[in-house]
Amino acid sequence: MEFPGLGSLGTSEPLPQFVDPALVSSTPESGVFFPSGPEGLDAAASSTAPSTATAAAAALAYYRDAEAYRHSPVFQVYPLLNCMEGIPGGSPYAGWAYGKTGLYPASTVCPTREDSPPQAVEDLDGKGSTSFLETLKTERLSPDLLTLGPALPSSLPVPNSAYGGPDFSSTFFSPTGSPLNSAAYSSPKLRGTLPLPPCEARECVNCGATATPLWRRDRTGHYLCNACGLYHKMNGQNRPLIRPKKRLIVSKRAGTQCTNCQTTTTTLWRRNASGDPVCNACGLYYKLHQVNRPLTMRKDGIQTRNRKASGKGKKKRGSSLGGTGAAEGPAGGFMVVAGGSGSGNCGEVASGLTLGPPGTAHLYQGLGPVVLSGPVSHLMPFPGPLLGSPTGSFPTGPMPPTTSTTVVAPLSS
């Protein structure tokens, strides 16, 4: 089985991008040092030569510092070896170092590494082989406890730019990774949260206002509030700072008294013929009657005009025109009242003239009368929706001599 960039995994040929052929030989001794299973560590401790331990340490350091991972800040050795575990003939290192499950996820970043060439172990006489194997056992349980290179001080940022990752060592980020309050490096999302410099303090040169919906300028360029600016634009002068006092109510003039009735409250002050102040009631009375209003008509309260039209007044006016509107006749029907304006026969009932059936007189009580002047002989009975056909006819005998006759009859709708 072959993968791009990895070569053939089914053979015993070492990976060219991860293992240096000069450090790991293809002799059977490599199988002795890299057996599969946890017991391989103890076996390697008893049968490993110092030179083999030195070569294994250099190989492990080279695994960590391979140039193939210089383009990513993530050390991908562990996931790759975990994938190679189930492949026949794959790397035996994945089997004994990590077991069935990987301890390093693919997104884990080593923050304490630096980009440096692999360092060889200085112990060449084999005295440190036991401590090195103990270190391998410790790494098997927790790989992040093994540090082959010197750790960086905490005050310096991690140089991730060597691996091709994002560079956070700029002035926008502090060494600990917290963002700084710098408006030059703020993103559009952070601009609303960062403290902004206060706006320029503006003040109206006319009234001294500091808050207005719209700032305006006068001819000289000074700031004006919206009210002062509009006033200056419309009137050509500055808006007065003191509002003019409202017009005093005439009825509450101090010291003013009616010359006629000596009242001090009125809706309107007037003057009489001599120029003295009088109240509204006395002034109107004198204007209409040319005499002073009598003191007996004086009231404590001010009488107002009732401007609402009442229906009772209209009924009284309608019933007073031309005598009575309709009268009950001898047979129970209502009659037409005829009378002369100058002969004094107003109120006489013309006998024999009935315009409606008995009991219908109440239908015409609210109707206004129609006044007709002249002789009655030309009036002819007419049918209507409420009146019906006349039951009698006009008298054929001679009519009493009248100069003018007034006939009052209800309207027919």
From Swiss-Prot:
The two fingers are functionally distinct and cooperate to achieve specific, stable DNA binding. The first finger is necessary only for full specificity and stability of binding, whereas the second one is required for binding. Transcriptional activator or repressor which serves as a general switch factor for erythroid development. It binds to DNA sites with the consensus sequence 5'-[AT]GATA[AG]-3' within regulatory regions of globin genes and of other genes expressed in erythroid cells. Activates the transcription of genes involved in erythroid differentiation of K562 erythroleukemia cells, including HBB, HBG1/2, ALAS2 and HMBS. Residues 297-327 are annotated as: Disordered. Residues 249-315 are annotated as: Interaction with CALCOCO1. It comes from the Eukaryota. May form homodimers or heterodimers with other isoforms. Interacts (via the N-terminal zinc finger) with ZFPM1. Interacts with GFI1B. Interacts with PIAS4; the interaction enhances sumoylation and represses the transactivational activity in a sumoylation-independent manner. Interacts with LMCD1. Interacts with BRD3. Interacts with CREBBP; the interaction stimulates acetylation and transcriptional activity in vivo. Interacts with EP300. Interacts with MED1, CCAR1 and CALCOCO1. Interacts with CEBPE. It is found in: Nucleus. The gene is GATA1. Residues 203-222 are annotated as: Required for interaction with ZFPM1. Changing R307H: In CNSHA9; altered transcriptional activity at canonical GATA1 target genes, affecting both silencing and activation of select genes necessary for effective terminal red cell production; partial loss of nuclear localization. Residues 200-330 are annotated as: Interaction with MED1 and CCAR1. Erythrocytes. The keyword Metal-binding applies. GO terms for cellular component: chromatin; nucleoplasm; nucleus; protein-DNA complex; transcription regulator complex; transcription repressor complex. The modification Phosphoserine is found at S26, S72, S116, S131, S142, S178, S187, S310. Changing K137R: Abolishes sumoylation. GO terms for molecular function: C2H2 zinc finger domain binding; chromatin DNA binding; DNA binding; DNA-binding transcription activator activity, RNA polymerase II-specific; DNA-binding transcription factor activity; DNA-binding transcription factor activity, RNA polymerase II-specific; p53 binding; RNA polymerase II cis-regulatory region sequence-specific DNA binding. GO terms for biological process: animal organ regeneration; basophil differentiation; bone mineralization; cell fate commitment; cell-cell signaling; cellular response to cAMP; cellular response to follicle-stimulating hormone stimulus; cellular response to lipopolysaccharide. It holds the Pfam family GATA. Residues 305-318 have a biased composition (Basic residues). Changing D218Y: In XDAT; stronger loss of affinity than of G-218-GATA1 for ZFPM1 and disturbed GATA1 self-association. The lineage of its organism: Eukaryota, Metazoa, Chordata, Craniata, Vertebrata. The modification N6-acetyllysine is found at K233, K245, K246, K252, K308, K312, K314, K315. Changing C204R: Increase of dissociation rate from bound DNA. It is linked to X-linked dyserythropoietic anemia and thrombocytopenia: Disorder characterized by erythrocytes with abnormal size and shape, and paucity of platelets in peripheral blood. The bone marrow contains abundant and abnormally small megakaryocytes. This is Erythroid transcription factor. Highly phosphorylated on serine residues. Phosphorylation on Ser-310 is enhanced on erythroid differentiation. Phosphorylation on Ser-142 promotes sumoylation on Lys-137. Keywords: Acetylation, Activator, Disease variant, DNA-binding, Hereditary hemolytic anemia, Isopeptide bond, Metal-binding, Nucleus, Phosphoprotein, Repeat, Repressor, Transcription, Transcription regulation, Ubl conjugation, Zinc, Zinc-finger.
